[in-house]
Amino acid sequence: MVSSSVSSVTEVKVESYVFPPSVKPPSSTKSFLLGGAGVRGLEINGNFVKFTAIGVYLEESGVAVLSGKWKGKTAEELSDSVEFFTDIITGPFEKFTQVTLILPVTGQQYSPKVAENCAAQWKAAGIYTDADGIAIEKFLQVFQTESFTPGDSILFTHSPESLTISFGKNGAIPEVSNAVIENKKLSEAVIESIIGEKGVSPAAKKSLATRIAEILNHFDA
């Protein structure tokens, strides 16, 4: 049962930030379990500079969805499988990502990079539409006047057809979201940018594979 697998979920500490085993996203009545968490950083002049700590949560029903194909696989098998992460990204259940700032950033610094990556990916695949352009503009507008200090969080709820955006201050998760953008591709592209084949946080991907393998081993349909 899902409840037995949920009871095995533990918190994860990334740098000085703790991601609890379960959370209730803004404007949601559901609890999501912590799939995994890790740092996002870049090598700059020979030093690994850490920018954010990222936690990836799954709606509890996602455990049952993933179990059919992935239960019994090792953490290494999941970590090496592009298909496994794609099944999380595109699965018919909600995901919640918490991007907590280690270094300060403004909304105008953060959002264009995400938007440009999404648009470039869609255009390369030949699937970019006018509706996608409108969704990108809405995404940029949500961040326009925002500024984030260490400990603040950018929060995304990835529903099958929409992306909900929220902002948390000083480690808190707000009860109400800031915006909902009705665009399936954007919802998937944002989480894909984190845990997809070219995801920005290999540490979060490794944590996700390790923990989901363990959660599925405790899951009984």
From Swiss-Prot:
Keywords: Flavonoid biosynthesis, Isomerase
GO molecular function: chalcone isomerase activity
EC number(s) from the headed UniProt entry: 5.5.1.6
One example of a Gene Ontology biological process annotation: flavonoid biosynthetic process
Tissues with expression: Flowers.
Species per Swiss-Prot/TrEMBL record: Gentiana triflora
Pathway noted in the entry: Secondary metabolite biosynthesis; flavonoid biosynthesis
Protein name, as recorded: Chalcone--flavanone isomerase
Pfam families: Chalcone
PANTHER family: CHALCONE--FLAVANONE ISOMERASE 1-RELATED (PTHR28039:SF8), CHALCONE--FLAVONONE ISOMERASE 1-RELATED (PTHR28039)
Remaining remarks: Part of the biosynthetic pathway for all classes of flavonoids, a large class of secondary plant metabolites, many of which are brightly colored.
Function: Catalyzes the intramolecular cyclization of bicyclic chalcones into tricyclic (S)-flavanones. Responsible for the isomerization of 4,2',4',6'-tetrahydroxychalcone (also termed chalcone) into naringenin.
Gene: CHI
Family membership: Belongs to the chalcone isomerase family.
Coiled coil: none
Entry-linked SUPFAM superfamilies: Chalcone isomerase
Site residues (Important for catalytic activity), renumbered to this chain: 110
InterPro entries according to UniProt: CFI, Chalcone_isomerase, Chalcone_isomerase_3-sand, Chalcone_isomerase_bundle_sf, Chalcone_isomerase_sf
